[in-house]
Amino acid sequence: MNNIGIAINPSKDVDNRILNMVVKKFKEKFNLKNIEVFNSFDIEEQNLADIDLLIVLGGDGTLLGIARSLNDSFNSPILGINIGNLGFLSSVDISDIDIALEKLKDGKYKFVDRMMLNCKVESDENKEELKALNDVVLARGTLSRMVKFTIFVDGKIYSTFKGDGLIIATPTGSTAYSFSAGGPFIYPDLELITITPICPHTKSMQTIVLKGDSVIDIYADHEEEKIYLTVDGQKAIKINHETSVKVSKNKKSVKLLVFDDYDYFKVLRSKILNNSKECDGEKL
């Protein structure tokens, strides 16, 4: 790792105190003369061709945004260091930076690929292609009534239902909005896609788990209602009547660096289930 870059969310570190501390520690630990620093808000416009490892300083939202922005152009691993709120996707919290540096120096880490989604939105007026690491959400506007959704999987009709919307999630996104809507946790290394309805007007419409290479087509009957499509809860577009939405596995995944002692279930307990450090499960 001769060329390390750091992407910082400036809203999380307005005085650069954390950034300067992290840069100093990495330079000392790896005997580096220079570390390139990038603003997470415009990182898509930057040249990261020579970066061997990208450190992301921020929260889950920062990492999600960078994963989407760099998906086409960046092939090196990403190490998330949480300086935000939840930090479920990050490999380490900023309070454990010294421990993380030792593990990096000793080579006690591995790379994991997390699948992403590709979303194509097509109408007579517009065509747009989006990507998501967590989820693609189709949902009605605040004052709209229920919408009728028709879902096809691999060209075969799966379901037609009325409700507030639906969530198409990756395993990484299974702990986010999908979980809040009643979807299951999916182990993040798997390649699966889930479809979870939002407030369906029938109890028979439940989450379905699909193979990772499934192709999902969604049509929404909403001539008089407002419908919005969002990716990772960050980018939203208004869906017009007669618009088709196609969601499938993205060709490229995102490569994350995690440490050898990473315990998914411990992170799940502490940051999602209990939101505490209780029940570490050292002994049963």
UniProtKB/Swiss-Prot annotation:
Write out the catalysed reaction: NAD(+) + ATP = ADP + NADP(+) + H(+)
Family matches, as InterPro entries: ATP-NAD_kinase_N, ATP-NAD_kinase_PpnK-typ_C, NAD/diacylglycerol_kinase_sf, NADK
Q: Determine if NAD is one of this entry's keywords.
A: yes
Q: Where is the major localization of this protein?
A: cytoplasm
Active-site feature positions: D60
Gene3D superfamilies xref list: Probable inorganic polyphosphate/atp-NAD kinase, domain 1 (3.40.50.10330), Probable inorganic polyphosphate/atp-NAD kinase, domain 2 (2.60.200.30)
Q: Which GO terms describe its cellular component?
A: cytoplasm
Cofactor(s) of this protein? a divalent metal cation
**Biological process terms in GO annotation:** NAD metabolic process; NADP biosynthetic process
Compartments where found: Cytoplasm
Which GO molecular function, any one, fits this protein according to its record? ATP binding
Q: Where does NAD(+) bind?
A: D60, G61, N134, D135, R145, K162, D164, T175, A176, Y177, S178, F179, S180, Q234
Transferase is among the record's keywords: yes
UniProt keyword annotations, A-Z: ATP-binding, Cytoplasm, Kinase, NAD, NADP, Nucleotide-binding, Transferase
Q: What does this protein do?
A: Involved in the regulation of the intracellular balance of NAD and NADP, and is a key enzyme in the biosynthesis of NADP. Catalyzes specifically the phosphorylation on 2'-hydroxyl of the adenosine moiety of NAD to yield NADP.
Task: Tell me where on the tree of life, at the top rank, the source sits.
Answer: Bacteria
| Cysteine disulfide partners in this protein | none
Top-level EC class as recorded in UniProt:
transferase
Q: What is its EC number?
A: 2.7.1.23
Name used for this protein in its record: NAD kinase
**Any signal peptide, and if so, which residues?**
none
Instruction: Tell me the protein family, please.
Output: Belongs to the NAD kinase family.
Q: Which Pfam families match?
A: NAD_kinase, NAD_kinase_C
Query: Gene encoding this polypeptide?
Result: nadK
